[in-house]
Amino acid sequence: MKLQKPKGTQDILPGDAAKWQYVESVARDTFSQYNYGEIRTPMFEHYEVISRSVGDTTDIVTKEMYDFYDKGDRHITLRPEGTAPVVRSYVENKLFAPEVQKPVKLYYIGSMFRYERPQAGRLREFHQIGVECFGAANPATDVETIAMAYHLFEKLGIKDVTLHLNSLGSPESRAAYRQALIDYLTPMRDQLSKDSQRRLDENPLRVLDSKEKEDKLAVEKAPSILDYLDEESQAHFEAVKDMLEALDIPYVIDTNMVRGLDYYNHTIFEFITSVEGSDLTICAGGRYDSLVGYFGGPETPGFGFGLGLERLLMIIEKQGITLPIETEMDVYLAVLGDGANSKALELVQAIRRQGFTAERDYLGRKIKAQFKSADTFKAKLVMTLGESEVEAGKAVIKNNRSRQELEVSFEDMMTNFENISEQLLS
């Protein structure tokens, strides 16, 4: 058997990993500005944590979860999304306690797992950035969280981003709409895809979310959920729209958007961008005011979003955005002869401990090959260290671009490399 990575997974090599680290760093910095703290939850959860919260009839649970029984006969699943594990942790760790400052603002970055057909920007192991805010029913929370995602996209330079907005209302208004949708779709049941015929019985709102051509045709003239909002739901949605306008965040109303998870109420949203003529969802989320109670905690409002890192990086690449990744090395040591081996290690370590990036040759290559490595690493400074330099206790350091040189003692290198660097690079 040829040993290779499983289907739908990837190896992220150093050149690409630098881009991942940059995007993750910008996300962390942005979320910190909004007073969010990082949470890390297990990669696997008890099956019920996901099935009961995400919804037994969703595609995630019925088709896409990686689940198994462990050696203790416990039903376990690899997490397919981030919200349910964070809510479970919020309840289990009693973050609802009065002494904990509200709202509780959390973000996470990590792997998720879904068994689905691998395609561009969508893998079986994928990486998600997500945020969850607990304890505030204020529509300003909805808008602040949406604005935070918008702020992140601005920082990354992503263009042509459109906010799509809808409201699912309260449980009561959603139930009234559910019945209206059943009444509308039942006469055309035979025209729906097989999946949507099942959804009509189990979760009719999901028919609106279908990507199948026949389903899209069927729901074109479906009733709008906004016509079924009760007074409280309408007021919440109007406040969200007003505050988005106050922040100059443009939006479009999309009444067919329902989101693929069962726990949402009131505001739901997606950010969509255009890549090579196709619309791609870059980020999605919404409000979920009953989920904490569902996990055995006190009734607690919640709002959050998730975005896929693979898709985000694909969009960055397709839009021709150059990420400002530091690729230059401060100094490269070319090493000649066994007599210089130990001193080279000593010097390169001392330079690194002063905060500089440094590399040396370990392979005993010819000097030309070592200088080529220095160029490949984009080294600003190059030093050649042979047995004669070791005997003298000093060596020449050269600016790799201007060719300016400076003879420096080992003692100065090991204690004051910053001054040497400034002299050669200024």
UniProtKB/Swiss-Prot annotation:
Biological-process GO terms, alphabetical: histidyl-tRNA aminoacylation
Q: What class of enzyme is it?
A: ligase
What UniProt keywords apply to this chain's record, in alphabetical order? Aminoacyl-tRNA synthetase, ATP-binding, Cytoplasm, Ligase, Nucleotide-binding, Protein biosynthesis
Give the subcellular location: Cytoplasm
E.C. no = 6.1.1.21
Among SUPFAM superfamilies, the record links this protein to: Class II aaRS ABD-related (SSF52954), Class II aaRS and biotin synthetases (SSF55681)
Q: Which GO CC annotations does the UniProt entry carry?
A: cytoplasm
Q: Name one GO molecular function term.
A: ATP binding
Question: Keyword Aminoacyl-tRNA synthetase, does the record have it?
Answer: yes
Pfam families from the UniProt entry: HGTP_anticodon, tRNA-synt_His
HAMAP family associated with the record: His_tRNA_synth (MF_00127)
Subunit and interaction comment: Homodimer.
Record's protein name: Histidine--tRNA ligase
The record lists the organism as Streptococcus pyogenes serotype M5 (strain Manfredo)
Source taxonomy lineage?
A: Bacteria, Bacillati, Bacillota, Bacilli, Lactobacillales
